[in-house]
């Protein structure tokens, strides 16, 4: 393993200060988890960036279009061979102390809640 960013922000948004945490997985691999150090200014700037992206891009999508994008991402995460899922299955137990088999089961169960038909049910309920 190596350095792993454990955050997500709009592509054009840049964090300036980071913290790290070194973890060792049960297989002996190590990783440095990197995450932004947030202060009020960073949170306000990030919120403004998210609002701008919503107005410029997301607002153009239909509800079905948004559901489709989320459903495609969920399909990736339900695949046990998806590289990001495999990485999560190695790192989450090291960070949380949860048993690796429970993490695998719960990731699968959790992701299934966001498949297309379930998302459409959520939307219909709202």
Regions found by a protein language model. Give the residues of each.
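N-terminal Rossmann-like NAD(P)+-binding subdomain of aldehyde/semialdehyde dehydrogenases
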Residues: 1-126
């Amino acid at each position: 393993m190596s350095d792993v960013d454990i955050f997500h922000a709009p592509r054009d948004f840049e964090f300036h200060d980071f913290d790290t945490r070194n973890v060792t997985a049960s297989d002996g691999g190590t990783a440095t988890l990197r995450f932004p150090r947030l202060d009020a200014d960073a949170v306000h700037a990030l919120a403004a960036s998210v609002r701008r992206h919503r107005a410029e891009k997301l607002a153009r999508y239909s509800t079905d279009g948004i559901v489709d994008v989320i459903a495609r991402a969920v399909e990736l995460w339900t695949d046990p061979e998806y590289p990001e899922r495999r990485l999560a299955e190695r790192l989450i137990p090291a960070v949380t102390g949860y048993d690796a088999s429970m993490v695998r089961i719960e990731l699968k169960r959790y992701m299934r809640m966001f498949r297309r038909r379930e998302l459409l049910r959520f939307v219909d309920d709202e």
